[in-house]
Amino acid sequence: MGRAGRIVRGIMVLGSVLLLASCGDSFNDAYCEANNHRNQQTVEHLTNVLEQKRNQPGLYLARARCHYFLGAYAQALQDASEVIRRLPNKADAYLLRAKAGKMLGQIPQALQDYSAAIKFQPTAEAHYGRGLKYLREYQGKDREALEDFTAAIRLDPKHVGAHAFRAQIYSRHEQFQHALADSETVLKLDPTTTNAYCNVGFAHYALGHDAEGRKFLTTCYQKDPDPQTRGYYETEVNKVLYARKPKRNSGGNYVAEGGVKTPYDREMERQQN
């Protein structure tokens, strides 16, 4: 791009920022996006305008968003906090501060900010973000995470991440039919999600659909040849297969895991007698 083109582009960005300033919050944080090559230029112009118009919370929120996408999380948090100071009910500011705080390792504060964002304006993104914090950072919070992922799906049925992590929780608690349904949804929404093939395959095994399970696991290993992936899922499958085998109790009789006799257990006892 020539010098004239750069000048025109700069004028366009500056014009957008000035329009943002004149409209207050109405344009909010719309001028920076992930991987946008103009983000740095936009944040510089926002900073210049803020030197003249410090009474515009919308400009601070816009700059916070730019800082976030540029990886300047401390600055993003600072600008979002300024918006919250001026507009204590601004859900977008709490959500952005939660995301920046998460990247800075401020987990308890991030969790509080996600909750505030949900209180003032429930969104799939806020529920999903809080659900991830419960799942990854806290022990014994699976129920809370599950509720958040379910809320995110209710608000956005096509939220791939919420379906994927809800499937993970269902599988952990041996609710394999639900885990299978969510993992299948992930594949429908995004067939490039490689581990979803493995998750569908394992859920089929857990439900006794071995042939179907093996088909999906084979596809998963073809798409992801990492030996660690195969090792993990084959170990989980072997656990399922081992759990199916009848065990002998102290009296020499066959009994299933947990001490509850199944028709298969009783048949094994009959054959032994």
Q: What feature does the model see in each segment?
A:
Residues 22-58, 62, 69, 259:
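N-terminal leader/linker segments that initiate helical-solenoid repeat arrays
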Residues 34, 68, 95, 102, ...:
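Position-specific recognition of the canonical hydrophobic site in helix A of tetratricopeptide repeat
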Residues 36-44, 71-82, 103-116, 137-151, ...:
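Structural signature of tandem alpha-helical TPR/SEL1-like repeats
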Residues 54, 88, 121-122, 157, ...:
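Short coil turns that delineate tetratricopeptide repeat
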Residues 57-58, 91-92, 124-126, 160-161, ...:
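Helix-start (N-cap) detector for alpha-helical repeat units in TPR-like alpha-solenoids
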Residues 62, 96, 129, 165, ...:
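Canonical tetratricopeptide repeat
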Residues 214-273:
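Terminal, low-structured helical/coil segments at or just beyond the last alpha-helical repeat
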